[in-house]
Amino acid sequence: MLSFNNTTSASSFQSASSRYLMSSSSSIGPPQQQSAKLFPEHFYPSGLSPRQSEALERLRPNTASRERNIPIQFTGKNPTTNSALEEYKPVPHVQVTSPKSSIVPNFVSEQRGLQPQPTSQAPTNYRQFVAAPRSPRGYGDYPEMTGKASAAGDSEPVQIPIKTQTPITQARAQETKIPTIVSPHPVYYYDNQEQPIQQIREEQPNATMETKVTGQGQPKRVGRWTLAQLRQTDGIIPSQAGWNKGDSQKLMTNFGTPRNTNTRVKSENLQEIPEDIANRTHGEVRLQSGTNKYCSQRGMTGFGSGRDVCREGVRVAQNPADLAELPEEKIRMSEGIVRLQAGTNKYDSQKGMTGFGTGRRETTKMVDSKHPEYDHEKPDQSEIPLQSGTNKFASQKGMTGFGTARRETTKMVDSNHPDYSHECSIDQTTIPSQMGSNQYASQKGMTGFGQPRWEVLDPSISWQNRKSQGMVRLQSGTNRFASQAGMIGFGTCRNTTFEAEGGELPYEAMKVSETIIPSQAGWNKGDSQKKMTSFGAPRDVKGKHLKRIWELEYPEEAEISLDRL
């Protein structure tokens, strides 16, 4: 973005412009006679692009309409004769014909200035076509304030063509060239014959460069460089690396499929690498490992399924058609060796296996030298040894409850009770004599968690007696008819409490079994935590203790009797 501070006084610009006289009618002469430059060389650029020139033109605070076309005029007398032609050696001077003097220096653009350029194919209104559109009317540019006619309807300035009918010799063509200025930056040309700069100028908004796409026929630019110039500096790949400029993975559906294009370096400014040198960078596969050049996972749906083809090679990234056929001995070298102690699941499948842990239809055949009577042609090869039971025909069909026993359970043989018949027993889960039986026990109606059964186990009952009897010992009470119905609070006491049989006890005997509270602590019999909102709020134990002492001293004023304390 280009911007200028227009608040600088006009007098400073006028004094500065007189110091920058580099090419004018009064300063034509040898380069040694030109005035010295005030700033270093890098402050004077050697050329501007059309966009930059248009942005500089828009910075002029003109009161009239700003011009877009800059006619070129030659200052000096025109030669009439051949003798005068030889003596006439002027330097062309670029003069901007604008109605107002400009603080922006006149310049020679890089398209038509410093070097003789061929005839441009751009349209005549190239600068209007490339640069930004016309700027709006300047601040205060109104006929009522300036007293001048508005320039909005004025026509464009007439471009004065350069007459070329006069025969120009080769010497004249060399003399009329604009002298080349060897400088990496644009050079400004100031004209000292312009009108005096207006002393009073109003503040103008800063101009902003707008980027436009150039027309056809002109090279596209990125900054001050063309795309053709930028492409000359494309990344050069060294000889030790390959080039994948034209490679493609189109139609490569398998993971890790090698490319069929060999890696080569192709560049205009690099010498082509021989094939033997380029192949040195290819990864070499040692003889102890195979190659998966022709392997495919097509149709391999199971995880970890082995491939049926295994090859080995020396190089990779070669055309498969160039490889010679390998003998079967080499192909079989890298196959997995299966030991004798392990089976094979080559043709196994889990198709249709919906249950977790469901056995396969085809299982590994086990050869047991200790049990030669095993027949491996049986449908189910999962033979279970004699020391454990079998769940071959067991089923959980219809088992909706968690932990529900199966219909078919393991038959237990008890050597201590040979009279027990497994064929006559309804329930095969026979419990030995050291334990009770829960054969007829039921949890029907037990909705509470941890609620005891109606029949409590009694170890003293013989195992033949299948009836469960709830025998309660003397040291504990019974909760047979206890119920938690209506108990909605956590830890709520039951409505059935212990009762002592034998009638009323004396007052002294009742006090013996009560909780004895030491003297340093109070009594919390009737205490309540109502309105206790804060965590850890202490109880009013001290107040209770003082109240009790007062009631002991003044029993006539106590609210309750001392016997009820």
UniProtKB/Swiss-Prot annotation:
Entry GO MF terms: actin filament binding; cytoskeletal motor inhibitor activity; myosin binding
Traits of the deletion mutant: Defects in the structure and function of body wall muscle, resulting in variable paralysis. Disorganization of the A- and I-bands of the myofilament lattice and accumulation of thin filaments in body wall muscles in adult animals. More densely aligned myosin filaments indicating higher contractility of the actomyosin network. Excessive contraction of the myoepithelial sheath.
One BP annotation, GO: actomyosin structure organization
Record's compositionally biased regions (Low complexity): 1-27
Disordered as annotated region, ranges: 1-83, 237-262, 369-400
Location, primary (coarse class): cytoplasm
Family: Belongs to the calponin family.
Domain comment in the entry: Calponin-like repeats 1-3 are required for actin binding and acting bundling activity.
Complexes and interactors: Monomer. Interacts with F-actin. Interacts with myosin.
Protein name stated in the entry: Protein unc-87
Species of origin: Caenorhabditis elegans
